[in-house]
Amino acid sequence: MNRLQEKYKSDIVKAMMDKFNYDSVMQVPKIEKIVINMGVGDAVSNSKALDMAVEELTILSGQKPLVTKAKKSIAGFKLREGMPIGAKVTLRGERMYDFLDKLVTVSLPRVRDFRGVSKKAFDGRGNYTLGVKEQLIFPEIDYDKVSKVRGMDIVVVTTANTDEEARELLTLLGMPFQK
């Protein structure tokens, strides 16, 4: 079992039950999944760009990403319906906790001028979205092999009903929010 998973079961559940006065342990919010999405706009003209993005996401997450395709044709972007334009990966269970642990303890502190992640990026239903400007903050990505600096979206989906519950859960898990 992962370090964060143990911390959740031993400490966080008790702390959340005390703070929000839940009747049952099953009411305590937990992390359901983490979705990492990488949009690759250059994939329209350069198919190698998408291959690199898929490779990087595989290294980061430990599983093969799903290639996302365009839903509509947009002439201004020279985009046809069904063209591959990105990659996403959904993490659950053990890999999800491993990734969150790595993100919070290793990767986010490596961001230049890092003062914490925004408190306003909750969606009203207890999910948190985080944008990363470059994939180089992750230690597994080799700087020399990177052809282009790409960002990604990381969505943490929780079972929390309110943003306040989700914020408390992520804070207890170690997410460095801005003061």
Swiss-Prot record:
Any GO BP: translation
Assembly: Part of the 50S ribosomal subunit; part of the 5S rRNA/L5/L18/L25 subcomplex. Contacts the 5S rRNA and the P site tRNA. Forms a bridge to the 30S subunit in the 70S ribosome.
Name of the protein: Large ribosomal subunit protein uL5
Gene3D superfamilies registered for this protein in UniProt: 3.30.1440.10
UniProt GO cellular component terms: ribonucleoprotein complex; ribosome
Taxonomic path: Bacteria, Bacillati, Bacillota, Bacilli, Bacillales
Entry-linked Pfam families: Ribosomal_L5, Ribosomal_L5_C
UniProt xrefs under NCBIfam families: PRK00010.1
Family, as annotated: Belongs to the universal ribosomal protein uL5 family.
One MF annotation (Gene Ontology) recorded for this entry: tRNA binding
Alphabetical UniProt keywords: Ribonucleoprotein, Ribosomal protein, RNA-binding, rRNA-binding, tRNA-binding
InterPro entries attached to this UniProt entry: Ribosomal_uL5, Ribosomal_uL5_bac-type, Ribosomal_uL5_C, Ribosomal_uL5_CS, Ribosomal_uL5_dom_sf, Ribosomal_uL5_N
Protein source organism: Exiguobacterium sp. (strain ATCC BAA-1283 / AT1b)
Disulfide bridge partners, by residue number: none
Its job: This is one of the proteins that bind and probably mediate the attachment of the 5S RNA into the large ribosomal subunit, where it forms part of the central protuberance. In the 70S ribosome it contacts protein S13 of the 30S subunit (bridge B1b), connecting the 2 subunits; this bridge is implicated in subunit movement. Contacts the P site tRNA; the 5S rRNA and some of its associated proteins might help stabilize positioning of ribosome-bound tRNAs.
